[in-house]
C-alpha cells in the first residue's frame, strides 16, 4: 500500500487529547501503522544518566500516534484533507488534495 503521509508532511490531529494541533511528521513507522509528530502527544519519561554527556531526570518527548488520528494538511489550501493518488503523463504517481485538487508532492 502506498504511503499517504510521509516524513516532512504537516498533519493535523483529528481526535484525542491533542485534537486540532498541527505539526511536522518526524518519523513514519509503517510496520506499526504509527507516526511521530513534532510537538504533539508529548509524554514524560524518567531517564537515568548514561555516559558523560547525558543528564538524567524527567524528559519530555513525542510518542507515536496512529495514522487514523491525523489528516494531512494541504500546503495550497491550508486545510486538513484526505489524500488521493494520480498517475501523471510521464508515468509518475503523485499524491493530491481531495478538497482543492492540487498536487501535494514536490518535484
Swiss-Prot record:
GO terms for molecular function: rRNA binding; structural constituent of ribosome. Pfam families: KOW, ribosomal_L24. The keyword Magnesium does not apply. One of its GO terms (cellular component) is ribonucleoprotein complex. Keywords: Ribonucleoprotein, Ribosomal protein, RNA-binding, rRNA-binding. Transmembrane segments: none annotated. It comes from the Bacteria. One of its GO terms (biological process) is translation. Part of the 50S ribosomal subunit. HAMAP family: Ribosomal_uL24_B. Belongs to the universal ribosomal protein uL24 family. One of two assembly initiator proteins, it binds directly to the 5'-end of the 23S rRNA, where it nucleates assembly of the 50S subunit. One of the proteins that surrounds the polypeptide exit tunnel on the outside of the subunit. This is Large ribosomal subunit protein uL24. It comes from Fervidobacterium nodosum (strain ATCC 35602 / DSM 5306 / Rt17-B1). The gene is rplX.
Amino acid at each position: 500500500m502506498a504511503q499517504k503521509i510521509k516524513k516532512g508532511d504537516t498533519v493535523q490531529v483529528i481526535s484525542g487529547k491533542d485534537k486540532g494541533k498541527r505539526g511536522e511528521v518526524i518519523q513514519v513507522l509503517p510496520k506499526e501503522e504509527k507516526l511521530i509528530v513534532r510537538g504533539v502527544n508529548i509524554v514524560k519519561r524518567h531517564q537515568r544518566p548514561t555516559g558523560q554527556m547525558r543528564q538524567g531526570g524527567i524528559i519530555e518527548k513525542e510518542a507515536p500516534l496512529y495514522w487514523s488520528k491525523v489528516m494531512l494538511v494541504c500546503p495550497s489550501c491550508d486545510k486538513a484533507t484526505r489524500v488521493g493518488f494520480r498517475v501523471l503523463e510521464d508515468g509518475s504517481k503523485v499524491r493530491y488534495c481531495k478538497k482543492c485538487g492540487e498536487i501535494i508532492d514536490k518535484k
